[in-house]
Swiss-Prot record:
Species per Swiss-Prot/TrEMBL record: Mycobacterium intracellulare
SMART domains the UniProt entry points to: AAA
GO cellular component: plasma membrane
Compositionally biased tracts (Polar residues): 272-285
Name of the protein described by the UniProt record: Phosphate import ATP-binding protein PstB
Length: 285
């Protein structure tokens, strides 16, 4: 029988209690004279998955990176409006390292650190002094088990992460993000370079993480948004065009731009084409 993990309180997965709510309020973003996104107001309910859809250049990735303040040091970046986390502006003068413990991020391509597999997982735990060194392996085992990677790496925790496959590296990066117990997890096309098996595994993890986290994910994959999203927001040419429950947005879009973008996913009148996909939306919500 598998022994129960005894994690330090600071790194034990919290019991969902309402958690944080992130909110963008009249947010305008730009770089120099160019405005990338204009007057976006959008709520992210606690313990839910919100997917951000839109064509390339619509502003959704700039928006996502702003939620983590990743754009702060980009030349010419400017913003007006606000983003609130737990009712407090994220743009206040604050410790960005501590802020990013609360708002984690997983990128399109895996970015393991040049250190051992175990040290990767506990990097944030060590930096934030969330657990004593003697408990690092316990923390690493818990998070690697959660993402389904423990059995593959348990005998090679001292190895370089660059010896892992691309999919395994992405799972390692997810374990690292989860090890510090963020309130919000931002995902920037996290499966775009992965094989179907790993993609399915990560999508399942996203759904299970929504039991305790606020998850916000950029994706270009309509089917992925349908499978994972509780809510979906559609961006087009620097505007938030439409947002709402994923089922409603996929089956009953209200704006012309949304209808056109979702057309390949929705069956034509009197046709069965795409019916399995739209049925999946209806059944998953």
């Amino acid at each position: 029988m598998r022994r129960e993990q005894q994690l330090p309180a600071a790194v034990a997965a919290p019991v969902a209690d309402g958690g944080q709510l992130m909110r963008a309020v009249d947010l305008t973003l730009g770089f120099g004279p160019k405005t990338v996104l204009e007057q976006v107001s959008l709520d992210f309910p606690a313990r839910s998955v919100t997917t951000l859809l839109g064509p390339t250049g619509s502003g959704k990735t700039t928006f996502l990176r702003t939620l983590n303040r990743m754009n702060d040091k980009v030349s010419g970046f400017r913003h007006s409006g606000d983003v609130l986390l737990g009712g407090r502006t994220i743009f206040a003068d604050r410790d960005l390292m501590e802020f990013r413990r609360s708002v984690g991020m997983l990128f399109q391509r895996p970015n393991p650190f040049p250190m051992s597999i175990m040290d990767n997982v506990v990097a944030g735990v060590r930096a934030h002094k969330m657990a004593p060194r003697k408990q690092f392996k316990t923390v690493a085992e818990a998070r690697l088990t959660e993402v389904g990677l423990w059995d593959a790496v348990k005998d090679r925790l001292g190895d370089s992460p660059f010896r892992l496959s691309g999919g395994q590296q992405q799972l390692l990066c997810l374990a690292r993000a989860l090890a510090v117990n963020p309130d919000v997890l931002l995902l920037d096309e996290p499966t775009s370079s992965l094989d179907p098996t790993t993609t399915e595994k990560i999508e399942g993890l996203i759904r299970s993480l929504a039991d305790r986290l606020t998850v916000i994910m950029v994706t270009h994959d309509l089917a992925q948004a349908a499978r994972t999203g509780d809510r979906t927001a559609f961006f087009f040419e620097g505007r938030l065009v439409e947002e709402g429950p994923t089922k409603h947005l996929f089956l009953s879009p209200q704006h012309e731009e949304t209808v056109r973008y979702f057309a390949p996913f929705r069956p034509a009148q009197g046709s069965d084409r795409g019916s399995s996909q739209t049925a999946g939306v209806a059944e998953s919500q």
